[in-house]
Amino acid sequence: MHEMSVALAVVDQVAEAATRAGSITAVRSVRLQVGELAGVVPDALAFSFELACAGTLLEGAELVTETVPGRARCTPCAHEWAVGMPPRLICPLCDGTHTELLAGRELQIVDVRWEDGHKHSPTHAPTREPISEER
């Protein structure tokens, strides 16, 4: 179950961002984009996230996941389509097999809401560019 390692990585990244921001008293929610082709089971990730948050600044935080549908483009005819699950990577228009995956492999933190000890109001974590493996 690799969802636990994903959850631990998310908790580590959010905790690190909270430390850099300073005076963060609690994390309220974490929003993730999860591509339908990323190989992540949302229910298993939610369960793992709850366990990974225990005893940290994120304890009790809500995990919100947004599913990104898989999309592909045929190189020869430029047709784009939703690949579905299991993924259909043969072009439905021309039966071409030279396809490019456009979306569906995402696994990234989109937004974090936390409590700032000084302001007592939710703030957002700084955004970051996804690494190449996340695109």
What do these predicted regions represent?
Residues 1-61:
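Long, charged N-terminal interaction/targeting segments
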Residues 2-13, 40-42, 58-64, 87, ...:
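Extended interfacial segments that mediate partner engagement and assembly in macromolecular machines
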Residues 30-37, 66-70, 110-112:
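Short loop/turn motifs enriched for small/polar and acidic residues
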Residues 71, 88:
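Residues immediately within or flanking Cys/His clusters that coordinate Zn2+
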Residues 82, 96-100:
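Short functional micro-motifs and their immediate structural scaffolds
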